[in-house]
Amino acid sequence: GHFENLGIYEMIRRRCHLIVASDAGCDPDCAFEDLGNAVRKVWINLGVQIDFQRIDIKKRDATSPGLYCAIGTIKYPEPGAKDGYLLYLKPGFPSDGSLPADVNAYGLANPAFPHETTADQFFSESQMESYRSLGSHIIDVVFGSATASRPSGPTAAISPFWAHIEEYVSPKMTADRK
């Protein structure tokens, strides 16, 4: 098997301060096994803690769609070290009609979508396009209008992206606390 499927371990070992990890593993129950494995190994081997306030990514048959991402705070242990952030993305299939029509149709016809086994190495054109389109939809939802005006240059700020992610996550978290 693999040591850690999301690439989080190596990025934390390199002391990255903003990590974006996309979990495309077959996880229909949203057990977050790959994320749990990464968080555990990072803590045990590197002494770095990753804290999530809450993960509100839901399995396909949930009554509410949940979110496509969660934000974790990376607590680097060195004196004076700044915290880092982990943006954890995971595909879902909301039943609220928000998906593009072709993706929704594919998902309704294929109940395992978007958590089909990776043992299937021969995706059809419609299957491949549905995954690609879902990924594009997720990025548009999570990053919103910030993707339309991407900053350029090697020193461009990421604050517009991060601000939209926090805006996307915050209302859901506030509503759930009530």
PLM feature segments, named:
Residues G1-K178:
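Catalytic domains of lipid- and phosphate-ester/thioester hydrolases
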